[in-house]
Amino acid sequence: MTTVLGIEGTAWNLSAAIVDEDDVIAEVTETYRPKTGGIHPREAAQHHALHASDVIERLLKEYRDKGHSPENIDAIAFSQGPGLGACLRTVATSARALALSLDIPLVGVNHCIGHVEIGRWKTPAVDPVVLYVSGGNSQVLAHRAGKYRIFGETLDIGIGNALDKFARGAGLTHPGGPKVEEYARKATNYVKMPYVVKGMDFSFSGLSTAATDALKDNSLEDVCYSFQENAFAMLVEVTERALAHTGKSEVLLAGGVGANMRLREMLDLMCEDRGASFYVPERRFMGDNGAMIAYTGLLMFNSGTTLPIENSHVDPSFRPDTVDVTWIADEKEVL
């Protein structure tokens, strides 16, 4: 049975995990928490560099304590991108050192695809349309003709960053998304705001700015509610279009913003109307985590994909639709 150690560190979370084909065997996470404002890339990278050795040591100890030997690990996987360049480089350095130390192959994993594959692993989803929503990314994807094709995506910022930007302007503490959700539950009125869907793409920067301006004349609760309703309706609309276009019968929600219960409710209602199945992995697998990198690395390793050390550069703009999905049989579909 294949066993892979994976390291995630594209932004906030430094997380490492060891998985086999059945389950997550061990996992350790250290989260960067800024004193004020949003993420500071240099500080986040320093955090990851400071804690990387300790996280890996604790992970290997947990692995040994469960009766396993590091000699059983077949490969080291790491988040190659997309993400913050400084954070990616820090994690890549740790992964290279570990692979050389254990004399085992290295696997570079696309962070976005990691979210998709952990969702497919930990839910009954087989061939879903995926709504991937996180801080820096918002995309609608589905597997076709050997790749995860992007059917729609943000034209500017990710929904998570839009929520955080608005929350900071409203004086809410980080992370902003859960605070916005909390206040939205107490709303009594809808405030008209921009709704921007262009073809199959969406935009959030104008909505975030409009929501901040709306605080001058409306309650925080009503603005939070209206921001969520518009943003999530845009995401659900494009997901529904992709579902109709592809003819698929499953929707998978992935990424940290997927923890929002209102977004889940809206997607669930849409899927019910269309006769599609809706899947969400448990909360621990929604945000950035080492298990998703380890498991996707396992899939890649088992399909013959490894990465020479000399080619293991990171890519802060690494798009999921550039990755050959060698671990899923090509149905020879036509786009």
Curated annotation (Swiss-Prot):
<dbReference type="GO" id="GO:0061711">
    <property type="term" value="F:N(6)-L-threonylcarbamoyladenine synthase activity"/>
</dbReference>
<feature type="binding site">
    <location>
        <position position="164"/>
    </location>
    <ligand>
        <name>substrate</name>
    </ligand>
</feature>
<dbReference type="InterPro" id="IPR017860">
    <property type="entry name" value="Peptidase_M22_CS"/>
</dbReference>
<dbReference type="GO" id="GO:0005737">
    <property type="term" value="C:cytoplasm"/>
</dbReference>
<dbReference type="Pfam" id="PF00814">
    <property type="entry name" value="TsaD"/>
</dbReference>
<keyword id="KW-0819">tRNA processing</keyword>
<dbReference type="InterPro" id="IPR000905">
    <property type="entry name" value="Gcp-like_dom"/>
</dbReference>
<dbReference type="InterPro" id="IPR034680">
    <property type="entry name" value="Kae1_archaea_euk"/>
</dbReference>
<feature type="binding site">
    <location>
        <position position="260"/>
    </location>
    <ligand>
        <name>substrate</name>
    </ligand>
</feature>
<dbReference type="GO" id="GO:0002949">
    <property type="term" value="P:tRNA threonylcarbamoyladenosine modification"/>
</dbReference>
<feature type="binding site">
    <location>
        <position position="111"/>
    </location>
    <ligand>
        <name>Fe cation</name>
    </ligand>
</feature>
<keyword id="KW-0479">Metal-binding</keyword>
<dbReference type="GO" id="GO:0005506">
    <property type="term" value="F:iron ion binding"/>
</dbReference>
<keyword id="KW-0963">Cytoplasm</keyword>
<dbReference type="InterPro" id="IPR043129">
    <property type="entry name" value="ATPase_NBD"/>
</dbReference>
<feature type="binding site">
    <location>
        <begin position="132"/>
        <end position="136"/>
    </location>
    <ligand>
        <name>substrate</name>
    </ligand>
</feature>
<feature type="binding site">
    <location>
        <position position="288"/>
    </location>
    <ligand>
        <name>Fe cation</name>
    </ligand>
</feature>
<keyword id="KW-0408">Iron</keyword>
<comment type="subunit">
    <text>Monomer. Component of the KEOPS complex that consists of Kae1, Bud32, Cgi121 and Pcc1; the whole complex dimerizes.</text>
</comment>
<protein>
    <recommendedName>
        <fullName>tRNA N6-adenosine threonylcarbamoyltransferase</fullName>
        <ecNumber>2.3.1.234</ecNumber>
    </recommendedName>
</protein>
<dbReference type="GO" id="GO:0000408">
    <property type="term" value="C:EKC/KEOPS complex"/>
</dbReference>
<feature type="binding site">
    <location>
        <position position="115"/>
    </location>
    <ligand>
        <name>Fe cation</name>
    </ligand>
</feature>
<feature type="binding site">
    <location>
        <position position="177"/>
    </location>
    <ligand>
        <name>substrate</name>
    </ligand>
</feature>
<keyword id="KW-0012">Acyltransferase</keyword>
<dbReference type="InterPro" id="IPR017861">
    <property type="entry name" value="KAE1/TsaD"/>
</dbReference>
<comment type="function">
    <text>Required for the formation of a threonylcarbamoyl group on adenosine at position 37 (t(6)A37) in tRNAs that read codons beginning with adenine. Is a component of the KEOPS complex that is probably involved in the transfer of the threonylcarbamoyl moiety of threonylcarbamoyl-AMP (TC-AMP) to the N6 group of A37. Kae1 likely plays a direct catalytic role in this reaction, but requires other protein(s) of the complex to fulfill this activity.</text>
</comment>
<comment type="similarity">
    <text>Belongs to the KAE1 / TsaD family.</text>
</comment>
<feature type="binding site">
    <location>
        <position position="132"/>
    </location>
    <ligand>
        <name>Fe cation</name>
    </ligand>
</feature>
<feature type="binding site">
    <location>
        <position position="181"/>
    </location>
    <ligand>
        <name>substrate</name>
    </ligand>
</feature>
<keyword id="KW-0808">Transferase</keyword>
